[in-house]
Structures are given as structure tokens and as C-alpha cells.
Amino acid sequence: LTTTTTEMLQAIQNGDLQKINSLFEYFLMNEEPEAQYEIADLFMQYGYLNEANRVYEHLQFIFPNEAQLSIDRASVLIELGEEDEALQLLMGIDNEAPEYPQSLLLLADYYQMQGLYEVAEQRINEALEIMPHEPLLKFAKAELLFETGRFSEAVRLYEELHEKEKNVAGVLLSTRLAEVYRAGGGYETALDYYMEALEEIVTPDLLFGSGYAAFQCEKFELAIKQLEDLKELDPDYFSAYLLLAESFAMLEDNKNAYKVILEGIKRDEYEKSFYLFAGKIALKNHLTDEAIDHLQQAIALDPEYMEAILVLMSIYAGEERYSDIIALYEDLKNEEFDWSALYPIVADAYSEEEQVNRAYEIYKLAYNEFKEDASFLSKYCYFLIEDGQRHEARKIALQLNALQPYEQQWLDLLDTLE
């Protein structure tokens, strides 16, 4: 390497843009094209896209018929957002040139990024007609099929490649196979490929994927092992905490489940699903006050978090904290959030608090949604009886009898209401 090339190399590696600029013109005018080409690639690797483009443009001026330079420069131009100029370069490559399939592959990548999947597939298929056994082209098509949800077609290509080699384009094929089987719901096979991939390289994503697949296969002990390893490798991989806690819960190890989710909350105090799970599992550990606190925090993060609201109201109902149910409901109303699933609990709360008119109003709102629900209708019927609305109560009793004709209590109730 010449002194100038060596200095340019060091400036790039050190991120010294001022030095790069001071060397640039001399470098273009005096260095050999081979050195310039290598430095252009290095510019790309380090993110100096404008500098890479200038070098490729200079080399194109010297070698105007070199197709590889058109492809390399087009790749830079796409990164710079100069798509029209990039496409013009790629379209100008002769279809008889050895580099033509490579240009088609870059075009396919561009169209895929734009969401034009059919056009991208056409370009890859055209390249495959020229080079039907080229692993990079098969891999590119598999990637496109995977991205568009055509999992079985993607699997066929990935497995065909996997039979011959472990890696393509720097990607471990067992990893891709694990991901595509997982995406398609084939968790047993996905787990096998995850474990194969982990023999080659251990990464947080692979550990999480294997834990998730093991969980779906109901191999909860294995899921726990993988997720514990992940937690040790990367304590800030937040998704691991919920899945690990759920794995303990599936084994009815509720104490460890609660311990893990509390660790997760310490790591990510803004994840509402952590608080929801903590509330549920605290309840299983007979920690009602803690459960309520967790659910309140979940709702504080998302005032319309339906599942957390429903669980919290159910706890309040079980604890006969009817005023808390009403307060929560009124807060939701003030936020213009209305959810019919809450009506039965809220109506019961108003009834228990002897706010009869309000209870009747909510019961009527709930009726349209729950007129096939015998439990709701039963409470509504007895509320109407207590409120002296026997005629309306009889209509509800008739519905109950129609829903459950084998229940003697509804016949007896109808006799009472006659």
C-alpha cells in the first residue's frame, strides 16, 4: 500500500472525516484503481456513502463499460436515496453480461424494500433462469417468500440449501429454518433447528427463540433453562422475563413466576404486560393487595388497557369493594372510554351500593350484549324483583327458562311471579 492509501485507510478506521477530505482529491488523482476500489468498499462498510459514491463515479469514468462498477455504485445510490439514478445504472447493464444476475438481485432487493414483492420475485426468477443453482439467488428468493408469509415455499428452498451448506450470505441457515418454522407454527421442528443453531453460535435471539418454541411445545423445563441462560447472557432482554415467568406459572411454580416478573419490572418499568401478569400471579400467591397495586400501575400506563381493567374489577368484586368498581368505571367514562364487557360488574356494584336508578341504567345497557348469559340474566332478574319491576322480571325469567329449561328454579321463579 502507498503512503496515501495507508493514511486514507487509517483515517476511515479512526472516523477522521477532516483527514479523509484532505486526502481525497490526491487519492483519486494518483492512486491505482485497484486501491481506489478497495477503499470505496471500505467507505461503504464504515458508512461514508457520499465518499464511496464519488470513488465509484470516478472509476466509472475510467472504466465506463465495467458492469460491476455500475452495480456497486447503484447499491450506494440506493442507500443515499438516489433511486432513479441507481435504477438507470442497473437497467443499463447488458443482459448478456456475467454480472447481469447480480444486477437483477440488487433490483429485487430494491423492489422488496419498496413493498413491490411481485416485481421483486420476477427479477429473482429471471436471475434463477440464468443461474438456477446459485445459492445466493435461491437464498434471496427464500428470504422474499419468508417475508411475504409463504412459509412452506420458503422452507423448501432453505432446506435445499441447508442440505449442502451451513451458511449463505453470512446467515446461518438453521437459524432461518428455525424462524420460518416458528412463524408458520411448526414449533417442534423450529425447536430442533434452534438447538442446532445454538451448537454453532449462542445469541440472545436464538436463546429466546428456542425458549419460545419450547414453551409452545409445552416443554416448560427446557423453556426455563433457555430463558435463564438468556437472562444471564443479556439481563436487558426484556421479553425473556415475561416468557420465563409464564413458563414457571405453567409448572404451577407461582412463587418463582412472581419473582421473575418482579425482576422484569425492575428492568423495564414501562411495560404494561409485566404489570398485568404480576397482578394475575400475585393473586395466585394470595397477595391481593399487591395484585391490585400491579394492575393499577398497568392501567396508569394505559388507561384503556382492557384486560387489566377487567381483572382489577373482578378482584374488586371478589373483595366486595363496590365503591372502587364505581370509581374506576366513572374514571373511564370521564376519559370517554366505554366497554360493554364491564357493564355486568358495574351494574352489580351500583346495585350493592343501593344506587338503584344507576344500576338499572347499566343493567339495561348490558342486556343487549349479555341476553344469552344466564348468570347475568339471573342477577338482572333478581334486581328487577327487588326493585318492584315484576312484569319486566318475568320477561327475564322466561328467557332464563328458555336458556336452561332443565333448571327447576326458573319454573319456580315464574310461578312466584305469576
Locations of regions flagged by a protein language model:
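Helix-start (N-cap) detector for alpha-helical repeat units in TPR-like alpha-solenoids
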Residues: 32-34, 67-68, 99-102, 135-136, ...
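Structural marker of alpha-solenoid helical repeat scaffolds
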Residues: 29-30, 62, 95-96, 130, ...
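Canonical tetratricopeptide repeat
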Residues: 38, 72, 106, 140, ...
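Register position in tetratricopeptide repeats
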Residues: 13, 45, 79-80, 113, ...
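Canonical positions in the second alpha-helix
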Residues: 26-27, 58-59, 92-93, 126-127, ...
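TPR-repeat structural position
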Residues: 16-17, 49, 83, 117, ...
